[in-house]
From Swiss-Prot:
Short name of one Pfam family: NMT
PROSITE patterns for this protein: NMT_1, NMT_2
Record SUPFAM superfamilies: Acyl-CoA N-acyltransferases (Nat)
Catalytic machinery residues: 447 (proton acceptor)
The enzyme's E.C. designation: 2.3.1.97
Encoding gene, per UniProt annotation: NMT1
Entry binding sites for tetradecanoyl-CoA: 38-41, 171-173, 179-183
Species the sequence originates in: Kluyveromyces lactis (strain ATCC 8585 / CBS 2359 / DSM 70799 / NBRC 1267 / NRRL Y-1140 / WM37)
Sample GO molecular function, one term: glycylpeptide N-tetradecanoyltransferase activity
Catalytic function, reaction form: N-terminal glycyl-[protein] + tetradecanoyl-CoA = N-tetradecanoylglycyl-[protein] + CoA + H(+)
Protein name in UniProt: Glycylpeptide N-tetradecanoyltransferase
Signal peptide bounds: none
PANTHER family referenced in this protein's UniProt entry, alphabetically: GLYCYLPEPTIDE N-TETRADECANOYLTRANSFERASE (PTHR11377:SF5), N-MYRISTOYL TRANSFERASE (PTHR11377)
Keyword list, A-Z: Acyltransferase, Cytoplasm, Transferase
Functional description taken from the UniProt entry: Adds a myristoyl group to the N-terminal glycine residue of certain cellular proteins.
Length: 447
């Protein structure tokens, strides 16, 4: 089967997954058969597409750290394993170059993620991070980094159950080596290293369908600088509309509407308490301690921005955060980059004291989130971001349409490694539109 045919099948399966709202039993036998192409994942402790889940929990709990080999799998003769010391500027630079030249880009190769060194320091080194979980493959002769994968520690709550795990991210193989099947070997090696620490579960996300998503969310985009987005062909001019009309449609006030202000260290205790209480509603969520919350949320210039709203008594009632991950624009004479803001974590006390899905509680939260996220969009625009991205996770469905977020073409699938879990709502209906009624039970956000 050609790569093009495989891509088409993946696209078909992705659409089917959305239509069936994560109910994998609705796949036809032929569609399930197509999953046999995933030779690697068939050998891993993951939920199969045709598996009937009767009980949530670990799939394989028989192993112990002493059962795990002390040495990695052998590589082809031209390559060697390495542990990437991201505290070393030269080695961090190797990761930076590999990601920025070979990581995810759009199908037309027009846009590519541009991870800054500061962003990588933030994303790769949360509290408890381990150097040996930053795994690389180098060319023996030149020492050039051609493969990378990262694991960082995280404690998850999955429907009230504590799951000690890692987040897997930044899996990247040099474009010219994609046929060498380095990706499965990188996954096996980081799994081996994590298992030696007696950790057996992992959370990862991706745009392609693998066995077997626990949830799927849709991307949504809110233009902040429509004119630039049009110029770089990130967006198109709708039929029966003019550029002037589109610019006017997406124009935001010059300054925030509320008394929102930058979160400071002195706000952390209250914001952390608010965050924990708000996150209780979600079925898949992080269980941060205060140091982790501080690391992920406090503002770092050009990386992550966080803001709070206080009531008249000075109590923190809301906070919102977003991170900056620009695109490099390839072969464009006008612009070299596109500023992108990504919705991160937020919390509000607007519906505390109400049932989450009650009419009154829902309306109170909808109004508050519309104010909070609209101000976040204004702040992002003032930071020279050109578009604001959000998933349909958390309670985002309550504000996406109101604030002129348009549904994107992309979907993000959430996977739990070595853990069975009933499907979790992702904030989209069967027709793939925003599900304002059920919303999402995914509270965790991965970079």
């Amino acid at each position: 089967m050609s790569e093009e045919d495989k891509s088409k099948k993946l696209e078909e399966l992705l659409k089917l997954l959305k239509v069936h709202d994560g109910d994998l039993s609705k796949f036809t036998s032929q569609q399930r058969k197509d999953m046999n192409e995933y030779k690697f994942w068939k050998t891993q402790p993951v939920t199969k597409f045709d598996e009937v889940i009767k009980k949530e929990g670990p799939i394989d709990s028989s192993k112990r750290p002493e059962d795990i080999p002390d040495t990695p799998l052998p590589l082809l003769g031209d390559f060697e394993w390495c542990t990437v010391d991201v505290n070393d500027e030269k080695q961090l630079e190797d990761v930076y170059v590999l990601l920025n030249e070979n990581y995810v880009e759009d199908k037309d190769s027009t846009f590519r993620f541009n991870y800054s060194r500061d962003f990588l320091n933030w994303g790769l080194k949360p509290p408890g991070w381990k150097e040996e979980w930053q795994v690389g493959v180098r060319v023996k002769e030149t020492k050039r980094l051609v493969g990378f994968i990262s694991a960082i520690p995280t404690n998850l709550q999955v429907r009230g159950n504590d799951v000690r795990s890692v987040e897997i991210n930044f899996l990247c193989v040099h474009k010219k080596l994609r046929s060498k099947r380095l990706a499965p070997i990188l996954i096996k090696e980081v799994t081996r290293r994590v298992n030696k620490y007696d950790i057996w579960q992992a959370l990862h996300t991706g745009g392609v369908v693998l066995p077997s998503p626990v949830s799927s969310c849709r991307y949504a985009h809110r233009p902040l600088n429509w004119s630039k987005l049009y110029d770089v062909e990130f967006t198109a001019l709708p039929a029966n509309a003019t550029k002037t009309q589109m610019i006017a449609k997406y124009t935001l006030p010059k300054t925030p509407i509320s008394n929102i202000k930058l979160m400071e260290e002195r706000h952390v205790d209250e914001a952390f308490e608010l965050f924990n209480k708000y996150q209780q509603r979600f079925e898949l969520r992080p269980n941060f301690d205060k140091e982790e919350f501080r690391h992920w949320i406090l503002t770092r210039e050009d990386v992550v921005y966080s803001y709070i709203i206080e009531n008249d008594e000075g109590k923190v009632t809301d906070f919102v955060s977003f991170y900056s991950l620009p695109f490099t624009i390839i072969n464009n004479p006008l612009y070299k980059d596109l500023g992108i803001g990504y919705m991160f974590y937020y919390a509000s006390d607007a519906d505390f004291g109400y049932d989450r899905f009650s009419a009154e509680g829902t309306e109170r939260l909808r109004k508050r989130l519309n104010l909070l996220i609209n101000d976040a969009c204004i702040l992002a625009r003032n930071l020279k971001m050109d578009v604001f991205n959000a998933l349909t996770s958390q309670d985002n469905a309550l504000f996406l349409e109101d604030l002129k977020f348009g549904p994107g073409d992309g979907f993000l699938n959430f996977y739990l490694f070595n853990y069975r879990c009933f499907p979790i709502t992702g904030g989209i209906k069967e027709d793939q539109t925003f599900d304002v009624e059920k919303r999402s039970n995914v509270g965790v956000v991965l970079l």
